[in-house]
Amino acid sequence: QKPALLTTTLWDFPSQQYGDETQGDKNYRGATPAYIIRNLLHRYTRPKELVVDPMAGSGTTLDVARELNRRALGYDVNVTRKDIFHCDARKLPLEDEKAAFVFLDPPYSTHVHYSDDPRCIGKLSALTPDYYKAMELVLDEVKRILRPGRHMALYVSDSFQKGKPFCPIGFELFQRLSRRFEPVDIICVTRRNTTLDKGNYHKAAVEGNYFLRGFNYLFIMKKA
């Protein structure tokens, strides 16, 4: 049985994947919950339309799109499977206004080592302007390839590392998105990962007087 579409701006999923099929790789660090892609594509695309993921990771977007009879293209500097093209999201090999929908799940600063490729944005700290400059180039490419009147979504978390300043990545990227697209809505997605299940992490957060990341932003935007 397929999951029902969600109708509020608070999304909480029991797992990374749904059903008996595999969407992406559940063991891939930072894998996007397949439920998110399913909800977005049901709302903002139609069968046979082209869905693009410039930071495809383990291919969750591609699998969900094809399951829903959408065409899909995925790009990444760290290729994990044959149907993902080796490419920097700042320079996509796609013609203008070809995509009906674009999904982005970028690195949230330097928390996860994704690749040894020097072009990997995950090597850039969100404490520096370089991260945001790189993401602006990615957003420019998304705007270029997206058809007018169609939607894109960006899934991201803020960043906090003990002993370092808090990085409001979500707010920073939303400002940059708003200069390129029309805001449609903001969804709060509950984070479910092994870190949040470990009691010692919660004990450390209390003792250190800081908070663990409990949610991700899902920004939904429209190209004028």
Residue ranges: model-predicted function:
Residues 1-224:
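Class I S-adenosyl-L-methionine-dependent methyltransferase catalytic core
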